[in-house]
Design a protein with these regions (language model features):
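Positively charged n-region of N-terminal signal peptides that target proteins for export
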Residues: 1-4
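Short S/T/G/P-rich N-terminal loop/turn motif that feeds into the first structured element of a domain
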Residues: 16-75, 82-92, 105-142
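Amphipathic alpha-helical coiled-coil segments
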Residues: 98-103
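Hydrophobic h-region of N-terminal signal peptides that target proteins for export
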Residues: 8-16
């Protein structure tokens, strides 16, 4: 009996640890390098504020949604989603939202990488913005 108790105590934390790492493997990451279209520089800050506010209020599955500027005409956008469903919800919201036309009028997408395992359905929805989908092959996170 003691052996069974010992083994159950030994393996229970391992099973939780495995489950925890699996959930992290479900994350989907979007990496976008954007160029501000000439003549649109004055609307960038307001547009970014509106986009951030909208995503923060309406997309609980978004873990990170951050803009970085290297100059007044180059922006990097970093997005992390809990899982495929959250990423697809974001894409649907963006494509159907009021801010999408302003976004494409303001930014030229130079590169757009999608990291994580995505479905064919999501790839089809994103085809006008990117076809660069990269499933994880190996690695770890602490």
């Amino acid at each position: 009996m003691r052996v069974l108790l010992f083994l159950s105590l030994l393996f229970t934390p391992l099973s939780f640890a495995g489950h925890h790492s699996e959930s992290k493997n479900e994350q989907i990451i979007f990496l976008l390098d954007l160029e501000v279209i000439e003549g649109k520089e004055n609307q960038v800050d307001d547009l970014i504020d509106r986009l951030v506010d909208n995503v923060k209020k309406t997309e609980p599955g978004t873990i990170a949604y951050e803009y970085y500027a290297s100059s007044k005409d180059r922006i990097f956008l970093y997005e992390v989603y809990e899982n495929h469903a959250a990423a697809e919800f974001h894409v649907d919201s963006f494509l159907q939202g009021d801010l999408m036309p302003i976004f494409v009028d303001t930014f030229r997408v130079l590169t757009f990488e999608v990291l994580g395992t995505t479905t064919e359905q999501l790839k089809v929805k994103m085809k006008d913005f990117t076809q660069d989908h990269r499933p994880k092959t190996d690695g770890f996170k602490r």
